[in-house]
Amino acid sequence: MLLRLVGAAGSRALAWPFSKLWRCGGCAGSGGTVWSSVRACGIALQGHLGRCSQQLALQGKLTSFSPRLYSKPPRGFEKFFKNKKNRKSASPGNSVPPKKEPKNAGPGGDGGNRGGKGDDFPWWKRMQKGEFPWDDKDFRSLAVLGAGVAAGFLYFYFRDPGKEITWKHFVQYYLARGLVDRLEVVNKQFVRVIPVPGTTSERFVWFNIGSVDTFERNLESAQWELGIEPTNQAAVVYTTESDGSFLRSLVPTLVLVSILLYAMRRGPMGTGRGGRGGGLFSVGETTAKILKNNIDVRFADVAGCEEAKLEIMEFVNFLKNPKQYQDLGAKIPKGAMLTGPPGTGKTLLAKATAGEANVPFITVNGSEFLEMFVGVGPARVRDMFAMARKHAPCILFIDEIDAIGRKRGRGHLGGQSEQENTLNQMLVEMDGFNSSTNVVVLAGTNRPDILDPALTRPGRFDRQIYIGPPDIKGRSSIFKVHLRPLKLDGSLSKDALSRKLAALTPGFTGADISNVCNEAALIAARHLSPSVQERHFEQAIERVIGGLEKKTQVLQPSEKTTVAYHEAGHAVVGWFLEHADPLLKVSIIPRGKGLGYAQYLPREQFLYTREQLFDRMCMMLGGRVAEQLFFGQITTGAQDDLRKVTQSAYAQIVQFGMSEKLGQVSFDFPRQGETMVEKPYSEATAQLIDEEVRCLVRSAYNRTLELLTQCREQVEKVGRRLLEKEVLEKADMIELLGPRPFAEKSTYEEFVEGTGSLEEDTSLPEGLKDWNKGREEGGTERGLQESPV
């Protein structure tokens, strides 16, 4: 309603009093009324109020209804509408210099190269120009669409359909009384009866017919029976009309096409906001992004992978100081492949590189190259490398490169062919670099084994940087990074706490450690603790390892007793076997999918003997043996234990060559989720493998049964104590079973003994001392924040 009235009144006549109102000191909706502002204007508005009083009254109603419209003045009127704080301090002599528009700002404001931020009040500018407040192009489109819809609605739903009658009624009421002017046979389906003007109130009536021949015979017979002379008989006219069914059938198709066209125009592939301006032809443009200086990750935030950090620092140094290497005849490596398990910090290391290196950093995901259109992948690869050459020297990071870098020749479907074409284009582009391009390509993947050899060869990715799970020193460094933002208890030392937590989390990756610290803070907040304490971290570690604690899960007394003796069997076997992992805690409170939970502290070692693996198998069978020994029956609770025992036995026989009958051979096992189409050994060998696995598992079971038979009283003690307390710590186990008869390591200092210093070696080589600044800078100017390493 506002737009309609303003347009009718004339925008120029209404714009002048609006500007006077703002000049006189404020918004009508934020403290006063429009008429008070008018009185404050004085003589300036006295001559114009007679002509525009109605417009001002309308503005007063609207401002009281929606003050948000006037909470911010339009552009061009900021100096007339100042904040209350600035009104007192502002003086007539102070002038604000006009804001300089950006060089490449779009029509919407000063947002940058691609249009930037739009106007807050575009309708006000149009009113100043004497135009309607709405956009003409959009209004014309909407007007045409609305007119078409209205016309169709009026035609199909408001036309007079006439009154339907029967043949008998037509003969008796119209034909016999001589009220018929003419008969119109429409589309050979029905007859429209046009009465003589002035005889009836209806314009026409109609009735259906079976066929034209039958209608003609019946009409002739009826007129003969009524004695109507041939000269007075009703005229019959045959016409063809459209009933709109064809147009109605086209409506769904037209609506669907309109929606698709609108989506293509306004969406990412169209020319609307956020589009690249090329419609369907823009799908071949790269989706790679050039990261700006708003990356808040630095190398100081990356720990536990110092060797990989040195490699990445050297790549940045290649681009910053190429002369240092070219003087010795060295060539800049073209790329590096970051590999390793999930959560070890590959992408985080790339983010830190983007935050530290003051060279352009271009990032893209491997899955963004493959789309529904054929040829999009190679086109985007070409466009991406063209962008990289344009911004050289720069770093190009391709995350999850296995999406396009899989080995070729493994499929014949269209998607596989498109992936191979994208990979071929990638190979060509990487080979097309010369030594002066100064573009370094980094890539990250969790599956280096499935990559094409042509992609990983030297000359494309010269270096393979493996980032594995951190050791105990690396975990301590990672804990220090993630403990920084936490509000710890005043009695806790970050160094001591990080070392203790590192000893409690063997095998954890950087992502797991980050999750532990976050869970500890959440647990502390859940209990309204003023700070994060050590017990919160212990609970968080149990939460990550064992899953969610289910204290409300109801177990039958018999089931609870079975679970208690099952866990007691695990604990006792591990306590009296030399190569078993030390026990930290055992609980019969359900966690995750399990009904019981035991936490061990495994040693970090890379080489295992046959005796060590055999003791681990015995420890995993302790629960099943305890059930058989104390209850005379077995349950399904040992399913996960049996699966691990079977995997360990097959690995010893098939992969590690620890079987005397099978010999010193090793066969590959399929990965989890993969299927082995063809076995690499014969049926006789497969039968021998199965026999050896059964024999090994049987030996472990018999040894475990013998051990628990000897320690039956100890298992009974642990089982009864578990039923009483539900959770047993290591101190409780020492009280019940006595000290463990074998030496074990449990502290950080014991684990790192004999490995040099207590912390990671973070020293840099001489050539990388000033890795993040050019030699020509002379040590005075730095690109970005230097790494503290």
UniProtKB/Swiss-Prot annotation:
PROSITE patterns: AAA (PS00674). Residues 767-789 have a biased composition (Basic and acidic residues). Gene3D superfamilies: 1.10.8.60, 3.40.1690.20, P-loop containing nucleotide triphosphate hydrolases (3.40.50.300), Peptidase M41 (1.20.58.760). GO terms for biological process: cellular response to glutathione; cristae formation; mitochondrial fusion; mitochondrial protein processing; mitochondrion organization; protein catabolic process; protein processing. It is a multi-pass membrane protein. Keywords: ATP-binding, Hydrolase, Membrane, Metal-binding, Metalloprotease, Mitochondrion, Mitochondrion inner membrane, Nucleotide-binding, Protease, Transit peptide, Transmembrane, Transmembrane helix, Zinc. Zn(2+) binds at H566, H570, D641. InterPro entries: AAA+_ATPase, AAA_lid_3, ATP-dep_Zn_Metalloprotease, ATPase_AAA_core, ATPase_AAA_CS, FtsH, P-loop_NTPase, Pept_M41_FtsH_extracell. The keyword Zinc applies. Residues 106-115 have a biased composition (Gly residues). Its EC number is 3.4.24.-, 3.6.-.-. ATP binds at V302, A303, T344, G345, K346, T347, L348, H482. Its cofactor is Zn(2+). Disruption phenotype: No visible phenotype. Conditional deletion of both Afg3l1 and Afg3l2 in mature oligodendrocytes triggers progressive motor dysfunction and demyelination, leading to rapid oligodendrocyte cell death. Conditional deletion of both Afg3l1 and Afg3l2 in mature oligodendrocytes also causes premature hair greying, due by progressive loss of melanoblasts that share a common developmental origin with Schwann cells. Residues 81-121, 749-789 are annotated as: Disordered. The keyword Ligase does not apply. It catalyses: ATP + H2O = ADP + phosphate + H(+). Binds 1 zinc ion per subunit. In the N-terminal section; belongs to the AAA ATPase family. In the C-terminal section; belongs to the peptidase M41 family. Homooligomer. Forms heterohexamers with Spg7 and Afg3l1. The m-AAA protease is either composed of homohexamers of Afg3l2 or heterohexamers of Afg3l1, Afg3l2 and/or Spg7. PANTHER family: AFG3-LIKE PROTEIN 1, ATP-DEPENDENT PROTEASE. NCBIfam families: FtsH_fam. This is Mitochondrial inner membrane m-AAA protease component AFG3L1. It comes from Mus musculus. The gene is Afg3l1.
